[in-house]
Amino acid sequence: MFNRPNRNDVDDGVQDIQNDVNQLADSLESVLKSWGSDAKGEAEAARSKAQALLKETRARMHGRTRVQQAARDAVGCADSFVRERPWCSVGTAAAVGIFIGALLSMRKS
């Protein structure tokens, strides 16, 4: 009925984007290196700013990859827990629902 994207398709898309960004960063780095010592004044400032931006972008990409992997691991653990203990999961969800309902009813009073 509903067409949800396959997790592997999403992971492949994320990997493709990361590869594209890495290729772009590599080509920017090679351009900056080839620009080399001919740069003076403003060009040198632009070069150093571009290098700083490149380092920052690579650091962010590395951090996001680590966070994405941690999120995938957490989802995998939750999925296996629910599949192994479905009634425990239903009970936990019901208890959380009752707790939230009690909090909301106290708030209205």
Curated annotation (Swiss-Prot):
Alphabetically ordered keywords of this record: Cell inner membrane, Cell membrane, Membrane, Transmembrane, Transmembrane helix
Induction comment: Maximally expressed between 6 and 12 hours of growth, in early stationary phase.
Annotated compartments: Cell inner membrane
Classification via InterPro entries: DUF883_C, DUF883_N, YqjD/ElaB
Top-level taxon in the UniProt lineage: Bacteria
Transmembrane segments: 87-106
Membrane topology: Single-pass membrane protein
GO terms of molecular function: ribosome binding
Cellular component GO terms, alphabetical: cytosol; plasma membrane
NCBIfam families, per database record: PRK10132.1
Family: Belongs to the ElaB/YgaM/YqjD family.
UniProt subunit comment: Upon overexpression binds to ribosomes.
Name of protein: Uncharacterized protein YgaM
Native source organism of the sequence: Escherichia coli (strain K12)
Gene assigned in the entry: ygaM
